[in-house]
UniProtKB/Swiss-Prot annotation:
Oxidoreductase as UniProt keyword: no
Keywords carried by this UniProt record: Cytoplasmic vesicle, Endoplasmic reticulum, ER-Golgi transport, Membrane, Protein transport, Repeat, Transport, WD repeat
Membrane-traversing stretches: none
Gene name linked to the record: sec31
UniProt protein name: Protein transport protein sec31
Length: 1276
């Protein structure tokens, strides 16, 4: 519950009737004394400024006017003649004043409307009729009750006669359903219902002994129900009445500790009632059931008026005599306020604490168990993820029972249908039909071309398909026709083999040799050169005729020797190209390439086909791509499809597409976009073509919106998006596209496509296709931030309930000892010992309860079960050195430790902070009441926490009505009067804390007298080993140590208690508390003669120090039927002489108290003196603590804050350079660095080592370190 604004006035108030920004009118309370003892009385108007987030500035009145007297009541109503309504004031001098609110705000001098003095005494209450705002009822002294009409204010009429009523009317209220019914309450206890129509009494309630009535209120919905309250401190009661039975109240509400002064029934919800009174409290009730929901912050003086806002019931105001009117809300919007004030009180000490507590209002926090009625909805619906709609509707009208219904929902059914069709076709592998269908349905030529190209890529020979798409298959047929007209057969041109012509002996030539002169004479000449073996001709020739040129002779000699390269060089030098090519054919590939290169170098000015041929022959198609005119891009593309190497094909296509893209940008010719898209598709360059497709998507979407008649913009956008995703999907399958950037974290080439994938996944998920959405999200890189969120959302939506494991239980112990329940005995038992007993379970009276293993939940409160994962936000459950299968309480005080006789098998060391047996702690008694105390027996439950435990989800106890925070009371050793504590088993071994605690007992009931405060520690035998033990530092967080009282007939001398740290509020005790908390402390009686004759028992060694609490007083063992009875260890020194007699009279606290520890060098919170070697500890741990605080669940705020406070103790030690030795500081620095590196195992190992081997340095701060390790591990 949050206090939104405060008005610094002791005044009665009224809310403005308008629904706009709320205003409050205040009138100086009659009889109240201001802080400056001023007697000025006035009417003021205040603008609360609730729309302003800054609530730190003090409010100032927006209008003010002086009055002749103080106010007992104020009312504000709507008026047709006054824009802001009329304010009516009930003055102490009997005057009824009316003001125009609008004129007051504007500062007009004639703001007062009228002043009527019909009442002979003070007007105590007034109210406007809720149905007829012109009717005003006023009641006051001597039973005077008037009804005034604002239209005729000078002539009110009176209800009742003077003789009938002589007591004062303290309160009144109009019926909310029947306009002419009015109820009044008087100081004499009369609750009278009036019928204003007949001007007579209707009935009078039998008000339980005629107790004075301070407030009345009608039920806002039921016209026969009303509530009354009494201002008596002896009977602070609220009565719920039903007029159908006026002899007795229907229900009585009890919760106030002093008289009730004001009631306010919420007009919008009859289940909400506010009451305030003399106990400084404002309580919220359910008057229908009598349940008290909770109380609002307690102030420091009477709360005499509380009112709901009439139009916005989220707000209400409460006026008190501490000089404030508090405007609050029932919503928990700032739950950290309570903790902030509690922390502030925690840091105060001594006089500062009590001085602050007198003026500091207390805070409280509670939540309504059900939503207020104005927030309830008879039906509601919301869209859920995954194409679902969740709707809630009432099963039956008038009953608080709803039916939840989840139904599928599709924004656009066409989207879902097309998605299913496409995914089905993909599964069947029928990609060609998809392309054909999409091409036929394409809305533009560009889109149609894209689908045609993709269809070509799907074919068995993609390059041939692309050539056919470009139209060059038809051109090849046309060229063949032209060759046929020249007398050449198509087969002759394209065939790989040459066939002999009939009759002529001529041979056909290959296509690439068509550049040479192809004539019959040349063919005949060549054929004649090849003769068969031994063939003779009639044409003899000479190798050398003598007429040859020198070049011809050189060629001939080279040929004779088979040196074709030299012959080729000579032929090329002489520019005999025909001879050179023939020689090159004989010389092999190297000679051919050399001849071709020479030829093309000579043809620079020749036909264009020679350059193309040069690029083809030289396998350098980059020249064609970069230099060919873009008007012939199709021809270039055809050449690439025909001759390009597979390794270069994609890059060549991309380069050609880039050239087309540059021309698009320079000329803004959108027609070329289709051509560039073709090139990128042919080269499988998805990142390039996607950018164009997305641009087309926007254009097509805009055109669709402009031309669509019935479609919505969402449907148009989704269809365009779906078309893009389909094209990309088919293209990726057709080209076997592999995304190599999925492992990158940023700078993706396909970033635009990834965004579309995420958008499309969201669309299909909205239509309930979660599998499809996940499929496309898996195509997005793992490190993409939006995709990661979307993937997690999909996985959560698709996650099915995991099969329930069969929970196995831990088998109970095979042998269970029969243990009798402890009996209350008025005499302490004699200390006897028996044989050692096996280790007992956690509860000595019942077998252990098996608990199923549960998964670790870092935010759930721990259950008391063995072998359970720890909760990083809950109190520590076991010691770091030796884990224990039990949940321990870090806040419980350490009980006294005894000694172990020889032969006793000690149990395992428990967690630090476990309370020992005997002397279970009980809380300080609550407020006094008339109830008598009752004795409560022990319980056999094993998982009940002690009263001083810190439970998960605990709530703070109600504070005193003076608003002073309670301090820790002195520990009570036994909850039963005249009863010594009874031990249930033998004492623990020396140096080791006990493993069990005594069963918890409930706090004592309220008593009329508080218990006496013990002011000195107990006296007794002091072992030499304890004389020099230094007192531990005061722990502001742990409970005070406690010990059971020593039996009066016990012969064993009581060991001296180790001195505990001083309390900031009370002196150290000098004696153990008495067994009867209502009796003075008795002196220890003389030792029993029977026990005095026995051998003296050696004193027990001091108990091990606990890092959680100050060292408690050591306790001797007492008789137990379960304790071992072996002789004491021989190595322990035996006591010499008889036991000590009774101690002397306790001295003063100052004389008995040990020397207090030296004050720290520097004040708490100072961090300027931390040494350099310890500074990493402070910096790392404090930074990680802040990270945990910002992310930990709010339900664990108390545990987080406690861990932070304990860390501050460590930082104070580091700042003062005390307690921690250099090697411990070095280890803590290593631990901090391990936490920073999230190496929690190393941090835990270091923590265990320090806890185990350096316990003298482990104060209260070590618990904070352990908690931080667990919390940091669980906090993302």
């Amino acid at each position: 519950m949050v206090r939104l604004r405060e008005i610094p006035r002791t005044a009665t108030f009224a809310w403005s009737p308008g629904a706009a920004s709320p205003l409050i009118a205040t009138g100086t309370r009659a009889g109240a004394v201001d802080v400056d003892f001023s007697n000025e009385t006035c009417l003021e108007l205040w603008d609360l400024g609730l729309s302003n987030d800054d609530a730190s500035q003090e409010l100032q009145p927006i209008a003010k006017i002086g009055t002749d007297s103080g106010f007992n009541d104020l009312a504000w109503t709507d008026s047709q003649d006054n824009s802001r309504g009329v304010i009516a004031g009930a003055l102490e001098n009997g005057s009824l004043d009316l003001w125009d609110a609008d004129k007051l705000i504007n500062g007009s001098s004639d703001a007062i409307i009228s002043r009527m003095t019909k009442h002979s005494g003070a007007i105590k209450a007034l109210q406007f009729n809720p149905k007829h705002s012109n009717l005003l009822a006023t009641g006051g002294a001597k039973g005077e009750l008037y009804i005034s009409d604002l239209n005729n204010i000078a002539n009110p009429y009176r209800l009742g006669s003077t003789a009938a009523r002589a007591d004062d009317i303290e309160c009144l209220d109009w019926n909310k359903k029947v306009a002419h019914i009015l109820v009044t309450g008087s100081s004499a206890g009369f609750v009278t219902v009036w019928d204003v129509k007949t001007k007579k009494e209707s009935l009078t309630l039998n008000n339980m002994g005629r107790k004075a009535v301070s407030a009345v209120a009608w039920d806002p919905e039921k016209p026969t129900k009303l509530i009354t309250s009494t201002p008596l401190e002896s009977d602070p009661l609220i009565y719920v009445w039903d007029l159908r039975n006026s002899h007795a109240p229907e229900r009585t509400l009890k919760g106030h500790e002093s008289g009730v002064l004001s009631l306010s029934w919420c007009p919008q919800d009859p289940d909400l009632l506010l009451s305030s009174g003399k106990d400084n409290r404002t309580i919220c009730w359910n008057p229908q059931s009598g349940q008290a929901y909770g109380e609002f912050p307690v102030v420091t003086n009477w709360t005499f008026q509380t009112r709901w806002n009439p139009h916005n019931p989220n707000f209400f105001a409460t006026a008190s005599f501490d000089g404030r009117i508090s405007i609050q809300t029932i919503q928990n919007t700032r739950t950290d306020t309570a903790q902030a004030i509690a922390d502030q009180n925690q840091s105060l000490d001594g006089e500062d604490f009590f001085a602050k507590a007198q003026t500091q209002p207390q805070v409280s926090n509670f939540s309504l168990p059900k939503a207020p009625k104005w927030l309830e909805r008879p039906s509601s619906a919301t869209f859920g993820f995954g194409g679902r709609v969740v709707s809630v509707g009432l099963i039956e009208k008038g009953k608080r029972a709803s039916r939840i219904k989840i139904t599928p929902f599709e924004v656009d059914e066409a989207v879902a249908k097309s998605t299913e069709t496409f995914e089905t076709a993909l599964k069947e592998g029928d990609l060609r039909s998809i392309c054909e269908t999409r091409a036929s349905q394409a809305a533009s030529e560009e889109e149609k071309a894209d689908w045609k190209v993709i269809e070509a890529l799907i074919s068995g020979n993609p390059r041939k398909g692309l050539i056919e798409y470009l139209g060059f298959q038809d051109q090849a047929d046309e060229a063949a026709d032209k060759l046929a007209k020249l007398g050449l057969d198509k087969e002759d041109v394209n065939g790989d083999t040459l066939t002999e012509s009939r009759g002529s002996g001529a041979k056909k030539h290959k296509r690439l040799q068509s550049m040479f002169d192809a004539n019959p004479e040349a063919d005949s000449f060549l054929s004649d050169l090849a003769a068969s073996k031994g063939a003779k001709t009639n044409n003899p020739f000479h190798i050398f005729t003598g007429s040859e040129s020198e070049a011809e002779q050189g060629i001939t000699r080279a040929l004779l020797l088979g040196n074709f390269e030299k012959a080729l060089d000579v032929a090329l030098k002489e520019d005999r190209m025909s001879d050179a090519f023939v020689i090159a054919i004989c010389g092999g590939q190297k000679c051919i390439e050399k001849a071709q290169e020479h030829y093309f170098s000579k043809q620079t000015g020749g036909p264009n086909y020679t350059r193309l041929l040069a690029s083809i022959v030289g396998k350098n198609l980059w020249d064609v791509v970069y230099n060919a005119d873009l008007s012939n891009w199709k021809e270039v593309m055809a050449a690439l499809c025909t001759f390009a190497d597979d390794k270069e094909f994609a890059d060549l296509c991309e380069a050609l597409g880039d050239r087309l893209g540059e021309q698009i940008r320079s000329t803004d010719d959108k027609a070329l976009r289709k051509d560039a898209s073709f090139c990128f598709l042919a080269g499988s360059k998805l990142e390039k073509v996607v950018a164009m497709w997305i641009e087309e998507l926007r254009e097509n979407e805009q055109k669709g919106i402009e031309t669509a008649a019935d479609d919505t913009s969402f449907s148009i956008h989704v269809r365009a998006l779906q078309g893009l995703i389909e094209k990309v999907t088919i293209f990726r399958q057709a080209t076997n596209f592999q995304d190599t950037e999925r492992t990158k974290e940023a700078d993706w080439k396909l970033a635009m496509l990834y965004d579309k994938y995420i958008e499309y996944a969201d669309v299909v998920a909205t239509h309930g296709r979660l599998q499809v959405a996940q499929k496309y999200l898996d195509l997005v890189p793992e490190k993409h931030p939006e995709a990661e969120i979307a993937r997690n959302r999909i996985k959560l939506a698709m996650r099915q309930a995991a099969p329930q494991r069969t929970q196995s239980t831990v088998p109970a112990a095979r042998t269970t000892l029969n243990r009798p329940l402890p009996q209350i005995n008025a005499y302490p038992p004699q200390p006897t010992f028996s044989s050692p007993a096996p280790p007992a379970p956690q509860n000595p009276y019942a077998p252990p309860t098996a608990a199923p293993s549960q998964p670790a939940n870092p935010y759930a409160p721990p259950a008391a079960a063995p072998s359970q994962p720890s909760n990083p936000y809950a109190p520590p459950t076991a010691a770091a050195a030796i884990p224990q299968p039990q949940v321990n309480n870090p806040y419980a005080p350490i009980g006294g430790g005894g000694y172990t006789p020889a032969g006793y098998q000690p149990p395992q060391a428990p967690a630090y902070g476990v309370q020992s047996l005997g002397g279970g702690s009980v809380p300080p008694p609550p407020r006094a009441s008339n109830q008598s105390p009752a004795v409560t027996t022990y319980t056999t439950a094993t998982n009940l926490p002690a009263w001083n435990d810190l439970p998960e989800g605990f709530t703070k106890p109600p504070t005193s009505r003076r608003g002073t925070p309670a301090t820790a009371a002195a520990a009570i050793s036994s909850p039963f009067p005249n009863q010594s504590p009874t031990f249930s088993q033998g004492p623990p071994p020396p140096g080791m804390p006990p493993t069990q605690r005594a069963p918890s007992v409930p706090p004592p009931p309220k008593g009329t007298v508080p218990p006496p405060r013990v002011t000195s520690p107990p006296t007794g035998f002091t072992p030499a080993s304890n004389l020099s033990a230094p007192p531990p530092a005061a722990n502001p967080y742990a409970s005070l140590p406690q010990s059971p009282p020593i039996g009066s007939t016990m012969g064993i001398p009581a060991p001296a208690s180790i001195p505990r740290g001083p309390s900031p509020y009370n002196a150290a005790p000098t004696m153990p508390p008495p067994s009867n908390r209502y009796a003075p402390s008795p002196a220890v009686q003389a030792a029993s003669p029977q026990l005095a004759t026995r051998a003296a028992v050696p004193p027990p060694p001091p108990a091990a120090a606990s890092p959680y609490a100050p060292q408690p007083a050591a306790q001797p063992p007492v008789a137990s039927s379960y304790a071992p009875s072996t002789p004491p260890p021989s190595q322990l020194p035996m006591q010499q002489g008889p036991p000590q007699g009774p101690p002397s009279r306790p001295g003063t606290a100052s004389s008995q108290r040990k020397a207090a520890p030296a004050p720290p060098k520097y004040p708490p919170g100072d961090r300027s003196h931390i040494p350099a070697d310890a500074m990493p500890i402070f910096e790392i741990l404090s930074a990680d603590m802040q990270r945990v605080k910002t992310r930990a669940p709010s339900s664990f705020k108390a545990q987080v804050d406690d861990a932070e406070r304990r860390l501050n103790i460590l930082f104070d030690h580091l700042n003062n350079e005390d307690l921690l030795r250099p090697n411990t500081i070095a280890d803590m620095a290593e631990l901090a660095r391990a936490i920073q590196a999230r190496d929690y195992e190393t941090a835990k190992t270091i923590h265990i080592d320090i806890m185990t081997n350096r316990t003298d340095e482990c104060g209260n701060w070590m618990v904070g370190v352990k908690r931080l390790i667990s919390m940091s591990r669980a906090t993302p």
